[in-house]
Amino acid sequence: MSTPSIAPAPAPLVPALAAKPAISPSPGPGTPGSITSKEWVIPPRPKPGRKPATDTPPTKRKAQNRAAQRAFRERRAARVNELEEQIKKIEDEHEIHIAAFKEQITNLSREVEQCRSEMTWWRDRCHALEKEVSVERSAKEAIVKEFRSSLSDREAVRSDKGLAPLTTSTPQARSSDRPDNGDASNNDSGEGREEVPLGCNDCSTSHCQCIEDAFTMPGVVAQEQSRRLDTTKPGLSEPQIKPDPEEMEIDFTSRFAATQQQDQSPTSVSSPAVDPCGFCSDGTPCICAEMAAQEEQRPRRNSFENNRLAPIQNLSQFTPPPSDGDVRSDVTLPPISQATNPCANGPGTCAQCLADPRRTLFCKTLAASRSPSAAPSGCCGGKGADGGCCQSRNTNVSRGRSGSNNNTSSGSSAAPSLTLSCADAYTTLSRHPNFSRATDELSTWLPKLHTLPKPRDFPLTDRGVPRAALEVEAASVMGVLRYFDRRFADK
C-alpha cells in the first residue's frame, strides 16, 4: 500500500469541518482495481498562553461552582434593580414634597406681603387719626380759652356796673323765708338765682343785660348742663342707686291734723306779688315768675321730707314670736319642689333641655332608668322587698317590723345625702374633658347615677299626681367622674 500524499497549504484559522478526500494512487501491478480512502481532521492551532476551552467540565464540583456563581450574579443583579427602583421612587416622592413646600412657601410669602401692606395701611390710618385728634384737641383748647376770656370779660363788666351791693342785699332779705336744707348745691343754685337784679339802667326793649347775666351764672349753667344730660340719656332717667322702699314710707297720722297750717303757709308765701320786670310780655315765659314759683315750692318739699318715717331696722325687737294658737295645723301647703319644678310636663321639657339635644337625651334616659319597670339592680339582683336591694334601709318590711324606737334610731342613723339637680349633674359631667367620648357609652355609666326620690317610694295611688323634681346624689356624680378618668385615660 502506498501512503497518500498531502498537498502543501497554509494553516487555516478556522478548523476544517470536512476532511479532504485522499488522492487515489495509481494501481500497482499486484493489486489491480482496488481503491483505499481515509479522512483526516486537523485541530486548530491554540492561542498562545491560553488553555483550551472545554464545554463540559471535567468534574462535578466544578459544575456546581459554576452554577452557584451564576445564581449569585443573578441575585445580585436583581437586588441592584430593586434598589434602583426604590431610589427612583424615593426621588419622585422627594420631588413631590419639594414642589408642595415650594407652593406653600409662595402662598405664605404672598400672605406676608398682604399682611405687611395692611399693617402699613393701618399705621397710616392711625397717624391720620392721631393728627385729627390733635387738631380737635387744639381747637377745643382754643374754644375753652375763648370761653374763659369771655366769662372774665363779663365778670369785669358786672363789677364795673356796681352789681355787688345789690347781690349782697338780696340774700339777706330772703334768707329768713327759705329753710336751710344743708345741701351745698341747692344753696349755691339758690344764691345764684337770688343775685339777679330787678332792673338796671342798660336794659332796652330788645336787649336786657340783666337776663343775660342771670343765664351766665354758675348755678344756672350747671342746672342747664344737668338738664341736657338728662335729656340726652333716656336710659339713665332712673337713679342708679334706688332708695330702700322702707325709707320712702310716709307718716299720714299728722297729714290731716295740720291742714290749717298748710293752708296758711301758701298764703304767707304767695302774699307778696311778683314784681314785674317790665321786659316780659304776656305770651313769653318770665324768669322772675319762675323763680318766685320755685321759692313757693321749697317749703312744701321740706314739709314732705319732714313727714317721712324712719326705716324700721330692728323688727325682731317689736314683733313677738308666733304662738301655738297662731299656727293652723290643718293647712297643708304644696311642696316647693312641685312649684319650682321646671320639668313639670316631663323630663326634657324645660328651656335648657330644649336648647341642648344632649341634655334632653341625658334627662330622658336618666328618668327612664329610674322608672319602676327598670331591671333590678344591687348586690342581690333585686331580690329584696318591693324589687329593691336586700341592703336597703327604707324597705317596707323593715318599716313593718320595727317599732317606734327602731324607727327613731334608723332615722337618726340615716343622714340625708347631698344631692344635685338633674341640670347641675349634667353641667358637672359635661365639664369633663372626655365627656364627648363618654356620650357614645351612655348606657355604661348612666346606671351608676343614683337618683332621689326612688320610684318605689311613691305609692301606686299617687301615680297621677305630678312627681317631685329629679335629684342625683353627689357621691354618684363623683364616682362617674372618677370612672371617666379611668376609662378615658391616655395610655
Swiss-Prot record:
<keyword id="KW-0804">Transcription</keyword>
<dbReference type="InterPro" id="IPR046347">
    <property type="entry name" value="bZIP_sf"/>
</dbReference>
<dbReference type="GO" id="GO:0010106">
    <property type="term" value="P:cellular response to iron ion starvation"/>
</dbReference>
<feature type="region of interest" description="Leucine-zipper">
    <location>
        <begin position="83"/>
        <end position="90"/>
    </location>
</feature>
<keyword id="KW-0805">Transcription regulation</keyword>
<keyword id="KW-0539">Nucleus</keyword>
<feature type="domain" description="bZIP">
    <location>
        <begin position="55"/>
        <end position="95"/>
    </location>
</feature>
<dbReference type="GO" id="GO:0090575">
    <property type="term" value="C:RNA polymerase II transcription regulator complex"/>
</dbReference>
<dbReference type="GO" id="GO:0031171">
    <property type="term" value="P:ferricrocin biosynthetic process"/>
</dbReference>
<comment type="function">
    <text>Transcription factor required for repression of genes during iron starvation. Represses iron-dependent and mitochondrial-localized activities including respiration, TCA cycle, amino acid metabolism, iron-sulfur-cluster and heme biosynthesis. Iron starvation causes a massive remodeling of the amino acid pool and hapX is essential for the coordination of the production of siderophores and their precursor ornithine.</text>
</comment>
<feature type="region of interest" description="Disordered">
    <location>
        <begin position="19"/>
        <end position="73"/>
    </location>
</feature>
<dbReference type="InterPro" id="IPR050936">
    <property type="entry name" value="AP-1-like"/>
</dbReference>
<dbReference type="InterPro" id="IPR018287">
    <property type="entry name" value="Hap4_TF_heteromerisation"/>
</dbReference>
<feature type="region of interest" description="Basic motif">
    <location>
        <begin position="60"/>
        <end position="79"/>
    </location>
</feature>
<feature type="region of interest" description="Disordered">
    <location>
        <begin position="224"/>
        <end position="245"/>
    </location>
</feature>
<dbReference type="Pfam" id="PF10297">
    <property type="entry name" value="Hap4_Hap_bind"/>
</dbReference>
<protein>
    <recommendedName>
        <fullName>bZIP transcription factor hapX</fullName>
    </recommendedName>
</protein>
<dbReference type="InterPro" id="IPR004827">
    <property type="entry name" value="bZIP"/>
</dbReference>
<feature type="region of interest" description="Disordered">
    <location>
        <begin position="397"/>
        <end position="416"/>
    </location>
</feature>
<feature type="compositionally biased region" description="Basic and acidic residues">
    <location>
        <begin position="149"/>
        <end position="161"/>
    </location>
</feature>
<dbReference type="GO" id="GO:0000976">
    <property type="term" value="F:transcription cis-regulatory region binding"/>
</dbReference>
<comment type="similarity">
    <text>Belongs to the bZIP family. YAP subfamily.</text>
</comment>
<dbReference type="GO" id="GO:1900551">
    <property type="term" value="P:N',N'',N'''-triacetylfusarinine C biosynthetic process"/>
</dbReference>
<dbReference type="GO" id="GO:0001228">
    <property type="term" value="F:DNA-binding transcription activator activity, RNA polymerase II-specific"/>
</dbReference>
<feature type="region of interest" description="Disordered">
    <location>
        <begin position="149"/>
        <end position="196"/>
    </location>
</feature>
<feature type="compositionally biased region" description="Low complexity">
    <location>
        <begin position="397"/>
        <end position="413"/>
    </location>
</feature>
